[in-house]
C-alpha cells in the first residue's frame, strides 16, 4: 500500500495544496511564496527521500508567519495520514547533521503523543527576509499535527543559515529513519499494541 497523503487547507490567510510520499526519491516541487522556507523544505525532502509537492498562497505581504505555520500544519497532517496504522515502522529516528560551522540533531518518536523541545540559539534574527523565529513555529505545528515527539538540538554554529539548514536536513534524515518499515517488526512497535 502506498504511504502517501494529499492535504488541502484554505483559510482567510492561506491556501495550501500539499502532497507527500514517504517512499519517494527526494523529489520536491515547491511554491511556498517564502523563498527561504522553500529552500529548507527542498533539503528536507531530498535528505529524507520524500516526494513533496506544495502549492501555497498566503498573506506574505504582511509577513511569512501564517504561510510558514500553515505549511507546518499541512505537512504534519500529511505525515500522520501517510503513516496510516504505523504497522511495521521503526518509530524512532535520530540524526546528527553538520553544515560547515553548524551541528544540529533531530530525534523523533512517532508515538501519537505530540511534544516539541527545541534547544539552541540562532545568532541572527533573520536570514534574508525570513524571520528565524518562524523555524520554531513551523516545527511545533509539524510535531503537533503529525502527533510526533520531536526534539531539535542546535549544538553550535556561527552562521544562522547553516544552523537552520542543518536542522532541516537532520529533520529529513530522522523522519526517514522513523518511518522506515522494519521487516522484524510485527504489527505496531509498542507494548500497548497501538500508537
From Swiss-Prot:
SUPFAM superfamilies reported in the protein's UniProt record: Ribosomal protein S5 domain 2-like
An annotated GO BP: L-histidine biosynthetic process
Gene Ontology molecular function: any one: imidazoleglycerol-phosphate dehydratase activity
EC number: 4.2.1.19
Ranges in a coiled coil: none
Entries under Pfam families matching the protein: IGPD
Catalysed conversion reaction: D-erythro-1-(imidazol-4-yl)glycerol 3-phosphate = 3-(imidazol-4-yl)-2-oxopropyl phosphate + H2O
Location within or outside the cell: Cytoplasm
PROSITE patterns reported for this sequence: IGP_DEHYDRATASE_1 (PS00954), IGP_DEHYDRATASE_2 (PS00955)
InterPro entries cross-referenced by the UniProt entry: IGPD_sf (IPR038494), ImidazoleglycerolP_deHydtase (IPR000807), ImidazoleglycerP_deHydtase_CS (IPR020565), Ribosomal_Su5_D2-typ_SF (IPR020568)
Pathway assigned in UniProt: Amino-acid biosynthesis; L-histidine biosynthesis; L-histidine from 5-phospho-alpha-D-ribose 1-diphosphate: step 6/9
Enzyme class: lyase
Keyword line: Amino-acid biosynthesis, Cytoplasm, Histidine biosynthesis, Lyase
One GO term describing the cellular component: cytoplasm
Keyword Lyase: yes
NCBIfam families reported in the protein's UniProt record: PRK00951.2-1, PRK00951.2-4, PRK00951.2-5, PRK00951.2-6
Family classification: Belongs to the imidazoleglycerol-phosphate dehydratase family.
Name of protein: Imidazoleglycerol-phosphate dehydratase
Species, as recorded: Geobacillus kaustophilus (strain HTA426)
Amino acid at each position: 500500500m502506498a504511504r502517501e497523503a494529499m492535504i488541502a487547507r484554505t483559510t482567510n490567510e492561506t491556501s495550501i495544496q500539499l502532497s507527500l510520499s514517504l517512499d519517494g526519491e527526494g523529489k520536491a516541487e515547491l511554491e511556498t511564496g517564502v523563498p527561504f522556507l522553500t529552500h529548507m523544505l527542498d533539503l528536507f525532502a531530498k535528505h529524507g527521500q520524500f516526494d513533496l509537492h506544495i502549492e501555497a498562497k498566503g498573506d506574505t505581504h504582511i509577513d511569512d508567519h501564517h504561510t510558514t505555520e500553515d505549511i507546518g500544519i499541512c505537512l504534519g497532517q500529511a505525515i500522520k495520514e501517510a503513516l496510516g496504522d504505523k504497522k511495521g515502522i521503526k518509530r524512532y529516528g535520530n540524526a546528527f547533521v553538520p553544515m560547515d560551522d553548524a551541528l544540529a540533531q533531530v530525534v523523533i518518536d512517532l508515538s501519537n503523543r505530540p511534544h516539541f523541545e527545541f534547544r539552541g540559539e540562532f545568532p541572527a534574527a533573520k536570514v534574508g527576509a525570513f524571520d528565524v523565529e518562524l523555524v520554531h513555529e513551523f516545527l511545533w505545528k509539524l510535531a503537533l499535527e503529525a502527533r510526533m515527539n520531536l526534539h531539535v538540538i542546535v549544538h553550535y554554529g556561527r552562521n544562522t543559515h547553516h544552523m537552520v539548514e542543518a536542522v532541516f536536513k537532520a529533520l529529513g534524515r530522522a523522519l526517514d529513519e522513523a518511518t522506515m518499515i522494519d521487516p522484524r517488526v510485527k504489527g505496531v512497535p509498542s507494548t500497548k499494541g497501538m500508537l
